[in-house]
């Protein structure tokens, strides 16, 4: 993903056909090491293709993928209820710890 992001950044910046060296330079400028195999595969697959056209095709493909609907909503509500109960239990435990922390000694006594 990082290789593709650097490639697209170069393309949007005006470089119509970024090379592996260009992508590697972008990645190293932010402290990321480039994976040679993945980078070479990406460059070979995208060579000669228009970035704007690729983005448009990808958007069409994403729009055609079903999103799942309301099936996951009921599971999320149950998980949220469990998280609230855990938070209450943690608060009670934290209160105990706070009372034990002082142990009768003040910081500035």
From Swiss-Prot:
CDD domains noted in UniProt: Ribosomal_P2
Matching Gene3D superfamilies: 1.10.10.1410
Pfam name, any one: Ribosomal_60s
GO annotations of cellular component type: cytosolic large ribosomal subunit
Keywords: Allergen, Phosphoprotein, Ribonucleoprotein, Ribosomal protein
Keyword Cell inner membrane found: no
Location of Phosphoserine modifications: 99
Record has Phosphoprotein as a keyword: yes
HAMAP family given in the database record: Ribosomal_L12_arch
Described purpose of this protein according to its UniProt entry: Plays an important role in the elongation step of protein synthesis.
Protein name: Large ribosomal subunit protein P2
Lineage: Eukaryota, Fungi, Dikarya, Ascomycota, Pezizomycotina
């Amino acid at each position: 993903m990082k290789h593709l992001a650097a490639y697209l950044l170069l393309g949007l910046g005006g470089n119509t056909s970024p090379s592996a060296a260009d992508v590697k330079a972008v990645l190293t400028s932010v402290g990321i090491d480039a994976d040679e195999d993945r980078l070479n595969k990406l460059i070979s697959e995208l060579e000669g293709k228009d970035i704007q056209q690729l983005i448009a095709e990808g958007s069409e493909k994403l729009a055609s993928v079903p999103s799942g609907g309301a099936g996951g909503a009921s599971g999320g509500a149950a998980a949220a209820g469990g998280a609230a109960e855990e938070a209450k239990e943690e608060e009670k435990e934290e209160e105990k710890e706070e009372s034990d922390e002082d142990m009768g000694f003040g910081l500035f006594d």
